[in-house]
């Protein structure tokens, strides 16, 4: 189901009222059913930077800081799985300078995750999902190190879609299934939805309850095509670096009011 939220940054004069409203929402949300899995299309970094007459990577940096905040929000609410769309296979078509800057940022952030106190204190497992072979060697190695160091954790999960495409994920799953059938490890008649799920980039992960897209665009952009068949979709008219906790809480609160039918 699609739900659109229009969000505006409040004037500093209204901050006390917003803080009060945020605390009210937090209490309401904590009293309701908490989603297990939230997925976010982190859109609007470049437009946010352009509005400030800054280069794209300025927006990407502040987008990465916003993601750190969202991880904290999820921990506070007990949302165990967070999946974020960081870089699509189509994003490689951007300018070389922007892609190179992004790759440098990804490498830095993966290396920070390895030593981040919160990752180890909260027990966050990091999964990098996508065609990793398309990534530069240094980024791939940093991503794999973050996965290796956090592999033993299972309190929370941070799935980072990098060099990712929903169609590519399905194609890669089909190839692996066909290979296992040909090798005799899988029978054709045994293939069902749950079997397919085991061949996705992050096997057996519960489907997202909620998909949020920031930036004002109303589309899913090839994100988690297999997994979001029954997810609740929320589109927010605010660039990702400006996404507020109050916006997040309003989405969760709206989700809690829904009767999910799962196609019935």
Curated annotation (Swiss-Prot):
Source species of the chain: Pyrococcus furiosus (strain ATCC 43587 / DSM 3638 / JCM 8422 / Vc1)
Q: How does it assemble?
A: Homodimer.
Swiss-Prot/TrEMBL cofactor(s):
Mg(2+)
Task: Please report the name of this protein according to its UniProt entry.
Answer: Tritrans,polycis-undecaprenyl-diphosphate synthase (geranylgeranyl-diphosphate specific)
Question: Which EC numbers characterise this protein's activity in its record?
Answer: 2.5.1.89
Q: Which keywords does UniProt give here?
A: Magnesium, Metal-binding, Transferase
Write out the function statement from the record: Catalyzes the sequential condensation of isopentenyl diphosphate (IPP) with geranylgeranyl diphosphate (GGPP) to yield (2Z,6Z,10Z,14Z,18Z,22Z,26Z,30E,34E,38E)-undecaprenyl diphosphate (tritrans,heptacis-UPP). It is probably the precursor of glycosyl carrier lipids.
Class of the enzyme per the UniProt entry, highest EC level: transferase
MF terms (GO), sorted A to Z? ditrans,polycis-polyprenyl diphosphate synthase [(2E,6E)-farnesyl diphosphate specific] activity; magnesium ion binding
Residues binding Mg(2+), per UniProt = 43, 232
Q: Might you name a Gene Ontology BP term for this protein?
A: polyprenol biosynthetic process
* Cofactor: how and how many bound: Binds 2 magnesium ions per subunit.
Residues where substrate binds: 44-48, 60, 88-90, 92, 94, 213, 219-221
Q: Where is the active site?
A: 43, 91
Give the family, as the similarity comment puts it: Belongs to the UPP synthase family.
